[in-house]
A protein has these predicted regions:
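Short regulatory alpha-helical segment in sensory/regulatory domains of signaling proteins that mediates
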Residues: 2-11, 19-21, 36-37, 56, ...
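… and, occasionally, acidic/histidine-rich disordered N-termini of signaling adaptors
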Residues: 142-184
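GAF sensory/regulatory domain recognition
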Residues: 3-7, 14-43, 47, 52, ...
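Short beta-strand-to-loop transition segments that serve as allosteric relay/switch motifs
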Residues: 34-36, 68, 100-111, 132
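Regulatory sensory and allosteric helical modules in signal-transduction proteins
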Residues: 29-31, 38-76, 87
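Signal-transmission/dimerization alpha-helices at domain junctions
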Residues: 57-63, 119-143
Length: 184
């Protein structure tokens, strides 16, 4: 959905959405890679590492109207793919935790990106970030509920192993209580 909205709002030829791996490393996974009008195979996507690092490490959005002549962002990737204009914005819910990026580019001079395009992409990225965070919170909630059900079941099983009454031994009286040690 986000890629479609980007194509509707910005004159990009290609949109790529990347998210950090869940394993805590800085590895990025391409989640969406589309070229205007068709689905682009994920294993053939190449984007500028310089642009990616600027967004992910510094949290800064990138806008370059002519990447071929911009010394800060020009790279072999840009030259080989003939990329002229680039937009990239971070995906984050708070300013400190960047968990991905939205990248858009165009090979033509007719589709030069502007500050207005950057503002639009930033707004779309904010909405997408909130949706990703909500999905993550929902997954965590479902996992917590699953664990609670498993603990309840374990408590039931443990209670079934306990005798229903203390043993009767002449000359002795027994009393006892048993309850689960761990509860959330």
């Amino acid at each position: 959905q986000v890629a479609s909205l980007v194509f509707e709002s910005v004159p990009a030829e290609r949109v790529i959405i990347m998210l950090r791996d869940d394993d805590g490393t800085d590895n990025m996974q391409i989640k969406v890679a589309r070229t205007r009008g068709k689905l682009e195979p994920i294993d053939e996507v190449r984007i500028s590492r310089t642009v990616m690092e600027e967004v992910l490490k510094n949290g800064q959005s990138v806008l370059t109207a002519d990447a071929q002549h911009d010394p800060k962002y020009f790279s072999q990737t840009m030259a080989l793919q003939g990329i002229r204009s680039v937009l990239a914005v971070p995906l984050s819910v708070d300013e400190r935790t960047i968990f991905g990026l939205v990248y858009a580019d165009s090979p033509t001079y007719e589709a030069t990106f502007t500050e207005e395009h950057l503002n639009i992409l930033t707004t779309l990225a904010s909405v997408a970030s909130i949706r990703v965070e909500n999905a993550s919170l929902m997954d965590a909630r479902l996992e917590r509920e699953r664990m609670e059900r498993e603990l309840e079941l374990a408590t039931e099983i443990q209670q079934r192993f306990q005798p229903s009454a203390p043993p009767i031994v002449e000359g002795y009286q027994f009393q006892g209580i048993s309850f689960s040690c761990y509860e959330i």
